[in-house]
Amino acid sequence: MTLSVASRIAALVLLAAAGCARDADDSFVASVQRLRPAVVLLSMRVPPEHKKDRYDDAYATGFVVASGNWGSDILTVQHAIDGAWNLHITIGNRLHAPARVVASNEDLDLALLRTPRRRLPSIALGSSTHLQGDVGREIGLLGYPVPDEFDDEGLGLATSLNTGRLSSIRKDALEVTLSIVPGESGAPVFIATTGEVVGVAESRFDEERSIGFALPVDDVKGFLHRYDRAHGF
């Protein structure tokens, strides 16, 4: 009888755990579906001294942070667009539009672009002040990885989801277990279960160990606030 009760309890625990896992997966899927429409591919031309490998063009990821009748503002990292010209955005291989740099900060490695395309889906920024208690939590990144020479047919067709964990909070960076590949710089980094954007993908530190860094979103908000204040918004 005791064994039977214990077995039932164990079965209930397993069912509850499975239900929690399904709920977490559903939340992750919902987060991706909500954020994806605002993530854009940035394509550009770069000077010869900035060229890498065989590419004449350069690519990065950005995401819309504000939009209205005046156009749309897109956030990315400054190093990705440094010295670039002929900037364009693409969303899901459907919408193509020119863009220009309206603000940048080399120290923060942030840049703000503007496109004349109006009323695009945008992403609300979260907060990075509370993240110390979230170390170990699952995170996601939505970006446009640059294809290698063996796979160049999917570029610009769809965003790619990259998943990992928030592994450490540093003074001016979030350490993540994400292998941030070329093209994903500038992508939003978000908490899987809530979809809260807490950082911007910046660089890969260790390819073998899949260690990357993201800029804390509070630094991003400060950058945007200073831009708005300087322009009377």
Predicted regions and their residues:
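Bacterial N-terminal signal peptides that target proteins for export
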Residues: 1-10
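C-terminal cap/linker of serine protease catalytic domains
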Residues: 23-32, 42, 87, 120-122, ...
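Flexible, gly/ser-rich surface segments that form the specificity/activation loops bordering the active-site cleft
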Residues: 27, 121-174, 180-184, 202-212
